[in-house]
Amino acid sequence: MPSVDIAAAAPDFAARPLGTLSPRDTVRGAVDGSDVWVHYGRPSRRGREIFGRVVPWDVVWRTGANAATHFHTPVDLVVGGADVPAGTYTLWTLPSRGGWQLIVNRQTGQWGTDYHADRDLVRVDLQVETLPAPVELFTVAIEPDGAGAMLRMSWDRTRVSVPIARKR
């Protein structure tokens, strides 16, 4: 049986590039014919327990990794029952054991740790569900739902969602 010299291989293994740990992604979706998008960082689970550990309960979370998560709509929307005028915003979440909230914030262009509550436009409740299998990469989706859409965010064994529709 061939053998491997672990001590000799270790420096090369340790020096290999890891790549981007939390790659950026943009997801687009249609809301009554209008293109909305979310630009966000996608952290990996890497075997960790996420909510309540990596992302603590009852603390505003950047909803992704690195730079703040941005959301753009060219039309006025209703997000979870709250009015969101056309524009670009940042999205934050407040996870708790008793329920989650989505925060739409007016400040843009900042790092994900630079949250200012005084710039909040709205806070809305999110629907929370437990998934049967863990999701490795934090994932945002905008899925068709009638004339509107559902904004869904999934990571580990948790999925949160909120309806979005064009304001009439």
Where in this protein do the model-derived segments appear?
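Mid-length scaffold segments of soluble, non-membrane domains
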Residues: 59-111
